[in-house]
Amino acid sequence: MVIDRTAVLLLQMGGPDSIEAVEPFLRNLFSDRDIIRIGPAFLQPLIARLIARRRSKRVAEQYRQIGGGSPLRKLTEQQAAELEKVLGEGYRCFVAMRYWKPDTSQALEAVVQAGITRIVALSLYPHYSRATSGSSFNELERVRARSATPFQVTCVRQFHDHPLYITSLCDRIGQALSGYADPGDVHLLFTAHGLPQSFIDSGDPYLDQIRATVALVMERFGGINHHLAFQSRAGPVKWLEPSTEKKIRELAGQGVKKLLMVPVSFVSDHIETLHEIDMQYRHEALELGIEDFRRVESLNSSPLFIDCLAELVRGGDRTEET
């Protein structure tokens, strides 16, 4: 019997898997006009090349410190494998990275080779922004338009308030809090990837969705002190405030001694968790007098999180046909 299968396309940012890949990865990132507009469109690839060359040495050193490359591809492929097990034989899962390999065109070619034309494109960014999910879906549409295959695509654009996503976050936080003698002494610092304020001013829903996630999580942790901040700022423009560095300084100044970091916009470990939080922010916090600095484990292939993805794929309420 021939099984009518659906391809699940997991859309993720991607990351350089070697030191040599850092500069071309950065070049791809800074060439994307959905995330940053540098001069006229025809000049952006050249400017992106110059920026990537200038930044690559510093960024490469950060990747060297976490093992020589990003684990994001491996972790996303593990998520794809676990999701395929949960979904069963009617589904095949593929990975499409926005700025590295396998890129969207490679992923769609693999779908074609598998003989599948129906796709559920699932963004692994829980919170929608035109700079993240929006960019990935735009790239998918460009690649699809060039293909001779008549794909039928359903897009899952966000899941910031999905009950299983909230439960999976709460599970990780609960595990971390159980390691303290008195959780009431702990301050939770939810840290999300930053975004230029201009995106929010133009109607991007990212900030509202981040706040909604935090509010839903905190319904289950009444009495625990919590805060929200934004990391990974780049460039001279105004970004969402407060920055994570600023909030850590503020909390240290208030005498906070136990700080538990909760990465809220990342579903897998990568440079922002393994270096920025685990190394950079840890060092700054300890220098400022915070005595106990910890981070909640990332979702990665948490069974609860994989169940969330499976429910979304099977036709949750965040889908639309394109």
From Swiss-Prot:
Catalyzes the ferrous insertion into protoporphyrin IX. It catalyses: heme b + 2 H(+) = protoporphyrin IX + Fe(2+). SUPFAM superfamilies: Chelatase (SSF53800). Keywords: Cytoplasm, Heme biosynthesis, Iron, Lyase, Metal-binding, Porphyrin biosynthesis. The keyword Metal-binding applies. One of its GO terms (biological process) is heme biosynthetic process. GO terms for molecular function: ferrochelatase activity; metal ion binding. Pathway: Porphyrin-containing compound metabolism; protoheme biosynthesis; protoheme from protoporphyrin-IX: step 1/1. It comes from Pelobacter propionicus (strain DSM 2379 / NBRC 103807 / OttBd1). Its main location: cytoplasm. Fe cation binds at residues 193, 272. It holds the Pfam family Ferrochelatase. It is found in: Cytoplasm. PROSITE patterns: FERROCHELATASE. Belongs to the ferrochelatase family. One of its GO terms (cellular component) is cytoplasm. HAMAP family: Ferrochelatase. It is an enzyme of class 4 (lyase). This is Ferrochelatase. It comes from the Bacteria. Its EC number is 4.98.1.1. InterPro entries: Ferrochelatase, Ferrochelatase_AS, Ferrochelatase_C, Ferrochelatase_N. The keyword Lyase applies.
